[in-house]
Amino acid sequence: MLRLTTLLVALHVPVTAPPVRAPVADKVKVVTSLTTYGAIARDIVGDRGIVSSIATGDENPHYVQPKPSFVPLLGQADVFVTTGLDLELWVPALLDKANNPKVTEGGPGYVAAYAGIDLLDVPTSYSRSQGDIHVYGNPHIWTSPLNAVQIARNILTGLKRVSPENADYFAQREKDFEDRIYQALFGEELVKLLSGPTLADLDRQGKLFDFLKTKQYQGAPLLNRLGGWLKEAMPFRGKPVACYHKEWDYFSREYDVPCVDYIEPKPGIPPTPGHVLEIINEMRTQHIQVLLSTNYYDRNQVMEVAQKTGAKAVIVPSNTGGAAGINTYFDLMNLWISELARAFGTGAATAN
């Protein structure tokens, strides 16, 4: 190097030091209890954050077994996203061990995903005979696309608190996520005509379909302009299904697919042979065509009930990452809708 420098000086060639690069800003470290929250967070943070999830996508979120590696993960986190109800009862012990004030409840990086969501199944009374009842309401909030919008807003709020210098960047990406949800749910054409927030407000109030049926555009009902997931779900709208566990209520409300029977008699209580037989008889009597279950429950039992009733089993992941190729919230909802449509149609549903 010395010889080269001497030669350059002799030739009167200016010697310059290599350019000094500005230090890359530290990326925001986001940890989520569930992979679906992680997928939403990833859409918002872009390349300015690193997102990790504790539970796997095919794991029952009620019964996650904490690993020692989770403690340093939370200890270094800037943001922690959890449902905030009584779904992940394993979270408080992890937070205690991590001892990170930033992400404990009340800290700037703690995000309760349920905030601002109208909870279903809030009990008016409680006793142990009801099983593992959720005392605050049904915590499976992510099964509704409009709830996913509110979850994204909650994550954005936490990100702004811990990384105000990136607030505008995160806000724009969160808005992009909302816009994509509206287009995926209602269809691009209807969103252009009425705007996503307007349609979302009507939907939350339970007035969307009456509005679309009675209001016209260019001489035809606005319902003709409906697209997206809601249009794909029209063939099975109003048709009852049987479910394994009471985790589809928000999905059922959005798409009007009521769960009328449950293999699991009460939350957290394994079904007895007698109860399973009752469900089989009820499904036969009511001509239930579809049995919906997530893929962490007893697959053999689900398939047995489906076989004995003539129903089609739809076995799908509850969260992103729970099956191959299901990486985003949009992948997850696409799968749920397409598998139910297939089950109610002529083809057989695929178990994932």
Describe the role of every protein-language-model region:
Residues 18-352:
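Extracytoplasmic metal-acquisition and chelation regions
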Residues 3-15:
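Bacterial N-terminal signal peptides
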